[in-house]
Amino acid sequence: MTMYLWLKLLAFGFAFLDTEVFVTGQSPTPSPTGLTTAKMPSVPLSSDPLPTHTTAFSPASTFERENDFSETTTSLSPDNTSTQVSPDSLDNASAFNTTGVSSVQTPHLPTHADSQTPSAGTDTQTFSGSAANAKLNPTPGSNAISDVPGERSTASTFPTDPVSPLTTTLSLAHHSSAALPARTSNTTITANTSDAYLNASETTTLSPSGSAVISTTTIATTPSKPTCDEKYANITVDYLYNKETKLFTAKLNVNENVECGNNTCTNNEVHNLTECKNASVSISHNSCTAPDKTLILDVPPGVEKFQLHDCTQVEKADTTICLKWKNIETFTCDTQNITYRFQCGNMIFDNKEIKLENLEPEHEYKCDSEILYNNHKFTNASKIIKTDFGSPGEPQIIFCRSEAAHQGVITWNPPQRSFHNFTLCYIKETEKDCLNLDKNLIKYDLQNLKPYTKYVLSLHAYIIAKVQRNGSAAMCHFTTKSAPPSQVWNMTVSMTSDNSMHVKCRPPRDRNGPHERYHLEVEAGNTLVRNESHKNCDFRVKDLQYSTDYTFKAYFHNGDYPGEPFILHHSTSYNSKALIAFLAFLIIVTSIALLVVLYKIYDLHKKRSCNLDEQQELVERDDEKQLMNVEPIHADILLETYKRKIADEGRLFLAEFQSIPRVFSKFPIKEARKPFNQNKNRYVDILPYDYNRVELSEINGDAGSNYINASYIDGFKEPRKYIAAQGPRDETVDDFWRMIWEQKATVIVMVTRCEEGNRNKCAEYWPSMEEGTRAFGDVVVKINQHKRCPDYIIQKLNIVNKKEKATGREVTHIQFTSWPDHGVPEDPHLLLKLRRRVNAFSNFFSGPIVVHCSAGVGRTGTYIGIDAMLEGLEAENKVDVYGYVVKLRRQRCLMVQVEAQYILIHQALVEYNQFGETEVNLSELHPYLHNMKKRDPPSEPSPLEAEFQRLPSYRSWRTQHIGNQEENKSKNRNSNVIPYDYNRVPLKHELEMSKESEHDSDESSDDDSDSEEPSKYINASFIMSYWKPEVMIAAQGPLKETIGDFWQMIFQRKVKVIVMLTELKHGDQEICAQYWGEGKQTYGDIEVDLKDTDKSSTYTLRVFELRHSKRKDSRTVYQYQYTNWSVEQLPAEPKELISMIQVVKQKLPQKNSSEGNKHHKSTPLLIHCRDGSQQTGIFCALLNLLESAETEEVVDIFQVVKALRKARPGMVSTFEQYQFLYDVIASTYPAQNGQVKKNNHQEDKIEFDNEVDKVKQDANCVNPLGAPEKLPEAKEQAEGSEPTSGTEGPEHSVNGPASPALNQGS
């Protein structure tokens, strides 16, 4: 046994001495069997757990003894003691292959650093689309689960750094070269290390030679308890956040439930941790020994303090994605410990903000992001972002070209990519116009282009997404076709010598063609004498005739079309070189002419009693020569021509009128001059021509029985349509009715009154209603009906002839009563209205229309001229007034006697051409109004709107000096509503006490208005009523400082009824001062006593008693305040307003009363609103329209409104007010079966008078109701017919006016 121990000790010693067989764990010399070493991967991130390690053992040493036996001993390497392997040493750990085959190097697993390494030093990374478009793939090994305690496993889309367990494979070396017979001994060695219990079991086989060979060595390890600090060295923690408590919970990632020392942890969770605070946790478990693991919990900031924000710019949103973490709240954590991480596809970025560019439009991209604090993730978010629409493609233009001078067309194919609409721009020189087109269009027609102009067209599609993106534009161009150029302008004609002219003009503003050429045509009369063309508009015309009128026409030619010529008239001068010879010749001729004239005067005086026809032959040759060549006027330029001729005090009208011979001497006048006929003529010089006089039937034994002062007059293309006659004298009344019977006339138009200005104008040739029937020779006349209207009187007569058995005939007698004593009617519409009435009674089977005034030439010719020319205007769309008046003079001398009548014909034609027929019968009103409101097409205004637009505004047509004076401006409530001077209501300072002085003052006209004191001004105007002019007053609502003037006006003008159409206030704004009070109130000299107040649902009636301080008598004034009418609106209940109007009319004087015929003395009605125009205008219009409807069963709303606008500014100023008048009248007079249904209060209004007034009067021989006083410029004395002395003899007419004053003749 002792020997055995020594042998064993000796073998152990040799083992230490044998350096060849000493093996360590890291031998630099490869084993004889070719053992290789594989280097393991690098250490993982600090956030990952440290790997488990395996202790490597050294191979056993083999000793051979000489005494033929061997022994195998296994010894531990000195390095295999209790030692913890550091991470650095693990990188160099070797792995051994026990099979003796060379090991293969372990492949390197992909890491975040392998896929994409972010650049350092920036918070934002930008990547191109080639990398961004890669598909997100899971990272291998990222989801591996470790069985080793303390290791963590976290599921994430992000790849984690791989951790490979470090393993060393040990291969034992054999140093004996011979195989000995086996002698086996079993030895077990147990060694305690820090890591494990090593149990070694060895079997020793002795060879026959006595050497011992170790054949097999088996080592078994039994694990011992590690320390808790070691076991949980790599423990990981997840932080869970509670948004309600704003506290964290730390979850310890271990497989067993551990204890946390002083801190309580439940299910491995530590609760109620505050953000950005540190907490220490001592971890222990019964599977490990002391010391415990001390874990420092570094709590991250709160999750709600971070927000993932889309920072993509909308302009780049089609190809760019931008994501950014924003800190929406502050925190105390160290921001350097925060890591932001994004993963988009297979790209990973550690940045707070990322931006991906060059992406595809309209694609979805997903990006995941997380935030780590000290390498511990505590929040994450995902975003799916769709890129915006991209810019559309470029459309393909098929063609673009000019279709005409003002039109072009472009067609195209739309782009392939999606878009919303097109934008088409067309550029002309420096001007650019763009318009949006619908996406479905592939063609567009361009209108209103400028001729012969190059247009560059640009067409692009656009799409409206987050912003509007325009696609590429397709371009094309074309040049429009040529068109006629515009007119040259600023043309001048100047004389360079007596017969030479220099003509210049400016180029046209629109040439519209390829070439430039100016042409000048020179005409003398109707003969073309020169035709020149130059490149510039500069002509020198020489060698013209002296003292000749020339017409110069200059126009521009663009190579394709001529322009409109600019026309000027100029005359050459006389030949100054022959001036002396001409003067000498003139003296001689003048002397001869003087001698001839003296001789003729002597001869005429000597032969005064000779036949007057011989005298006419002396001037016959001059009748036609003095006529002018006046062209007919087309309807389109009728108004412009009238304005041109009326300018400069009507100089052109006067020239035309004076060129017409008053009497054409070539037509003999014998019958009228015979002695037995001279007494039948009212005027000795107004006689009918023999060739067309009206011849009566002969009465046996009565010389001249076939004569009457009347002439046949041709109408427009209708021979003998009229008979123009003088007003019958008492001696010729029987002849007049004989003419009516024989000529089968059914209509008589009387354009005069029996007496005018205390002068007899015409005999009363019909019976009165009281008389009933009267015989005029053989003709018996019976009056059946008598109807009085404001401007005319219609009488229905029945005539029979005693000597004939024929039945009686109906004759309509129409007397126009509104022709003033002097001058002509101011409103030509009155004559158009008369014409409508006459034509309503005339028919195809009637004889000629008999028209007469006093002499049968002036007013008669005017009416016939208007009637005939209106027929021509309707038939040919042009009129030849001058030519027709010449024709009238050839058929009856002095027809259209004065220039004012000649102008009146033109005015009536202009009125008709501009405004047309606007009068409507009540029976036709409803279908008429229905058609007037139709829009055809819907885009155009309705006929009713067009009619309103034709209404003249009459702004500033008369002066408004008084109301605009500085001292009177404060008396106007509305500066836009100032009364015109011509019809304003003047006030007197004091009321004259005597009736005579009062009468004189009341009769004063407005002519002195301009000279009155400022205190005499009040904002009020006289308004034309239906029955007489200026019997109404339209006034503004009184101001506080004008209440006294308001009552003065009411007292001076004897107002009986006040109509108040306004409240006192509108909101907080005063619109009318309260001009009355309870009981008695004194305003200056006027005492106003409120006697009674009666309120109804529609209006309030107040009764005032007025007294003047210098008068004893009192007056009663009624005030009707209509309260259901808001400012600037229409009446809420029109029927209530109509009802009040009917009540008001009952308080006014009747139309035939003597009081109602006084002009300006009594204006019984005053209407006011806020400014005296808005509501007042509607009220006045309705009052006049109701009177017209009740009297004539017709309404003319257009003319009523036009008259109101002429009387006061702002009357019926809107279309809504205009249409309201139509609607109210239509609802007031409903139609049933084509007949107008009258209300009860109307039944007695529209009827013929069946009895004469008690005081005998010539119903048609008095002044017209309320004939207006004329302004000074209208009060011209007539130079017409003046009767001679004696009532029996004929009268004499001065042959027309000697000056261009506008006079009236007959």
Curated annotation (Swiss-Prot):
Protein modification: Heavily N- and O-glycosylated.
Residues bearing the modification Phosphoserine: S975, S994, S997, S1001, S1004, S1005, S1009, S1299
Subunit-structure text: Binds GANAB and PRKCSH. Interacts with SKAP1. Interacts with DPP4; the interaction is enhanced in an interleukin-12-dependent manner in activated lymphocytes. Interacts with CD53; this interaction stabilizes PTPRC on the membrane and is required for optimal phosphatase activity.
UniProt membrane topology term: Single-pass type I membrane protein
Keyword Phosphoprotein applies: yes
GO CC terms, sorted: bleb; cell surface; cytoplasmic side of plasma membrane; external side of plasma membrane; extracellular exosome; focal adhesion; membrane; membrane microdomain
Residues found modified as Phosphotyrosine: Y683
Gene3D superfamilies: Immunoglobulins, Protein tyrosine phosphatase superfamily
Identification of the protein by name: Receptor-type tyrosine-protein phosphatase C
Keyword Transit peptide among UniProt keywords: no
Entry EC number(s): 3.1.3.48
Pfam families tied to this protein: CD45 (PF12567), fn3 (PF00041), PTP_N (PF12453), Y_phosphatase (PF00102)
Residues annotated as transmembrane: 578-598
GO molecular function, one term: signaling receptor binding
Binding site for substrate: D821, C853, S854, A855, G856, V857, G858, R859, Q897
Top-level class of the enzyme under EC nomenclature: hydrolase
Cytoplasmic compartment spans: 599-1306
Domain (Tyrosine-protein phosphatase) ranges: 653-912, 944-1228
Tissue expression profile of the protein: Isoform 1: Detected in thymocytes. Isoform 2: Detected in thymocytes. Isoform 3: Detected in thymocytes. Isoform 4: Not detected in thymocytes. Isoform 5: Detected in thymocytes. Isoform 6: Not detected in thymocytes. Isoform 7: Detected in thymocytes. Isoform 8: Not detected in thymocytes.
Species per Swiss-Prot/TrEMBL record: Homo sapiens (Human)
Lineage start: Eukaryota, Metazoa, Chordata, Craniata, Vertebrata
InterPro entries: FN3_dom, FN3_sf, Ig-like_fold, Prot-tyrosine_phosphatase-like, Protein-Tyr_Phosphatase, PTP_cat, PTP_recept_N, Ptprc
Effect of G865R: In a breast cancer sample; somatic mutation
Catalytic site: C853, C1169
